[in-house]
Amino acid sequence: MPTCTRPAADFTPEQLRFPAIPGYTVRADFTGGELSSDLGAAILGAVDRRIGMIDRFTAAITDFRDVRYITHSLRDLLTQRIFQIACGYEDGNDANALRRDPMFKLAAARAPLATDNLLACGATQSRMENALRRSDLYRMAEALVLQFIAGYRSAPASITLDLDHTADTTHGQQELSFYNHHYGSYCYLPLLVFEASTGALVTAVLRPGKRPTGAENAMIMKRVLRLLRQHWPRTHILLRGDGHFSNPELMQLILDDGNADFIFGLTGNAVLARRAEGLMKNARGHLALHQAMHAQKRGPAVQAVRLFGEFEYAAKSWSQAHRVVFKAEVLASACRQTGGSNGAPNQPKSGG
């Protein structure tokens, strides 16, 4: 019986090339050998060698160790810890196993297959983290802002900064971990700042799990704005955030900048409810009309009516009045409104 055979083709495995480290060229192929499930660490290392984020963090921290007894440099410790977290290994004791991983060693610019150059163990990582002082953390937050600025070739005409306090649930006896009723757990409540159009991280500030005060918000953002203004004096800056940020201290800071504005959530109160009641009556009337027309088969069913309005408002603690935009919303289910039982409109927004 005749058979048909095809000549074997020459085959070269496709390779991935990475930036070299001293004394080594770095390539990845798929022919076996020493294995690792964390190629991402090597990719992160290659990216960092281009942008220099770990170098910024290293320069921000004061290392008080005696140089005669240092096995792992501060830069190596930060590289190992940060990349472990990025790859999903949050626990410090994960370092006990990953210190031998060739990809994590490669990320730290160490020979990946050597057996005499292990990375730091979990105990060393723990000592490093506990040695950090408040001033180190402050300078690391500054380093993030400088990294954000370095991502631009020239000063942008305008940027929008989104401010957000995000719950980070804690377990055990972590320092400054507090119970937060809103989130229903013990947590930290770090402040994260992102640039809205690109999603780029501007900075992150670790803080206790309690609700921030206006003075604290202003203190943090004063430092962020100062760094931005040193590099971008003419850039218009818009800050956005929820009701955590509608504090007189932060609002005044933004007004004093001269080329910045804000859009913040505003907690409802009796004064705002009275100012919005006229629009709420209109919303109820619109819904009643739609329901009547639907009952007569003269129109579609309407589940909600939403109307928007605005007015000038000044709380006693504010230095001036600001424009408040609010939503009056009435739902068809039980003809109830959202936002609370006191008749207040839903989530008014204040702007400067």
Question: What is the predicted function of each stretch?
Answer:
Residues 166-168, 207-209, 244-246, 267-271:
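Active-site beta-loop-alpha junctions enriched in small/polar residues
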Residues 1-212, 216-231, 256:
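Dynamic "connector" segments at or just before major functional cores
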Residues 251-260:
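Short, surface-exposed basic-aromatic patches at helix termini and helix-loop junctions that form
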Residues 160, 236-238, 261:
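Hydrophobic "anchor" residues on beta-strands that sit immediately upstream
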Residues 172, 247-252, 273-277:
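A short acidic (Asp/Glu
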Residues 164, 235-246:
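Acidic/histidine-rich, metal-coordinating catalytic segments
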Residues 2-3, 12-26, 263-352:
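An anionic, glycine-rich sequence signature occurring as long contiguous blocks
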Residues 105, 214, 227, 253, ...:
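Flexible, acidic glycine-rich loops studded with aromatic residues
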